[in-house]
Amino acid sequence: PSLQSPQFSPQVLENFKSYAGVSEIGPFHKCFSSVVGPNGSGKSNVIDAMLFVFGKRAKKLRLNKVSELIHASDAYKDSPLQYAKVSVYFHEIVDTGEGDDDYEVVEGSEIVISRLARRDNSSQYQLGNRNATFKKVAEFLGSKGIDLDNNRFPILQGEVEMISMVRVALTLIYWNSPRV
């Protein structure tokens, strides 16, 4: 029997960093997704949005306060935007075939997790369009097999190289170890 697993559907950004208005990112592949593009194309902001909605504090996003996530281009200088919001849509899937794209969405499994950043530096989580605590969001995701305490979710820029070097370093230690 095939197991159910969670899959990101689109990620929706509202007034988040370089994204004014509403922007939809995705959909994401069920097994593996990466964010690639030229310098300055917003890759880091997409990852920051994911980190934000999954509970990272402003300092972890290289910011002093959460209100710095709110889009602030010159176009909004006279009338600053009051909030930024990131919403991640999930659904559960069941593999149906041999191919990577052969799956069915489990009926009724769709849910949205959101986090809102306000100008007063407060933030609010939502689980299924209802206000929630971070603890409730983390418990829900944990029940679906997504562990937010695991530092491998997601793997960030620079970490891929570090991970690949671990194997090289261990191999060098092995080959350079004295033999008995």
What residues fall within each predicted segment?
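Charged, amphipathic alpha-helical linker segments immediately N-terminal to NTP-binding catalytic cores
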Residues: 1-9
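Gly/Lys-enriched N-terminal cap/neck module of very large, oligomeric protein machines
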Residues: 8-180
